[in-house]
Amino acid sequence: DNTILYADYFLSKVLGLLKSNSQELDTAMFYVSDHGESLGENGLYLHGMPYFMAPDEQIDVPALMWLNDSMSKVFDVESIKNKEDLPLSHDNLFHTLLGLMGVETKLYDKGLDLMTK
């Protein structure tokens, strides 16, 4: 599918840009797809089936986190790796980004931040 190919291309460009600036800046990327995609599994194509009958390919979405060396020293990377098989939601994205950027707000829930133990 061309959109998957383009997403790979785009992410490689973003990572290249971040890496090229990681000596001067703290850089990180957290990518989460908004939905999965069926590419012919069980005769299904595309996405958008009702949740109760949608196959795992549409529900379980990819996520990718990258931190440069300086950010990896600030955050517990092993703690993040230990969460890779946990079921997560977009709720985690909001709180993880707040924690990653050091934003203090009463809305922040440390329990939903992937960067915490």
Where is each model-derived feature located?
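Catalytic domains that recognize anionic headgroups
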Residues: D1-K117
